[in-house]
UniProtKB/Swiss-Prot annotation:
Name of this chain's protein: Large ribosomal subunit protein uL24
Subunit structure: Part of the 50S ribosomal subunit.
InterPro entries named in the record: KOW (IPR005824), Rib_uL2_dom2 (IPR014722), Ribosomal_uL24 (IPR003256), Ribosomal_uL24_KOW (IPR041988), Translation_prot_SH3-like_sf (IPR008991)
HAMAP family with a match to the protein in the record: Ribosomal_uL24_B (MF_01326_B)
Function recorded in the entry: One of two assembly initiator proteins, it binds directly to the 5'-end of the 23S rRNA, where it nucleates assembly of the 50S subunit.
Single biological process term from Gene Ontology: translation
Entry annotated with the keyword rRNA-binding: yes
Source organism (scientific name): Ruthia magnifica subsp. Calyptogena magnifica
GO MF entry, a single one: structural constituent of ribosome
Length: 103
């Protein structure tokens, strides 16, 4: 079970966007794509057949999983994630600071 999943609220802990929060759009093997953060400019060639106008666009670039942490809204801080098995035998993720289950 992965500790960071799709639509999790994460906080960036290093880099130019430090202390910024956002939702995870896509999870790759060891990288995550965070909505509206870690933007880079890409030069796009126009393609009239596809209806694409040329110019400079901003795209989101993946971040390493080690540079983000899950955001705990109860404590308003970054938190660590633990994995445990509940009474029904189903694995669940929880915050290590206050033992709340991550929904």
């Amino acid at each position: 079970m992965k500790k960071i999943k799709l639509n999790d609220e994460v906080i960036i802990i290093t880099g130019k966007n430090k202390d910024s929060t956002g939702a995870v759009i896509k999870v790759l093997d060891s990288k995550v794509l965070v909505e509206g953060l870690n933007l880079a400019k890409k030069h796009v060639r126009s393609n009239p057949n596809a209806g694409v106008t040329g110019g400079i666009t901003e795209i989101e670039v993946p971040l390493a999983v080690s540079n983000v942490a899950i955001y705990n809204s109860a404590t308003k801080k970054a938190d660590r994630v633990g994995i445990r098995t509940n009474k029904d035998g189903i694995k669940e993720r929880f915050f290590k600071s206050n033992n709340e289950v991550i929904v």
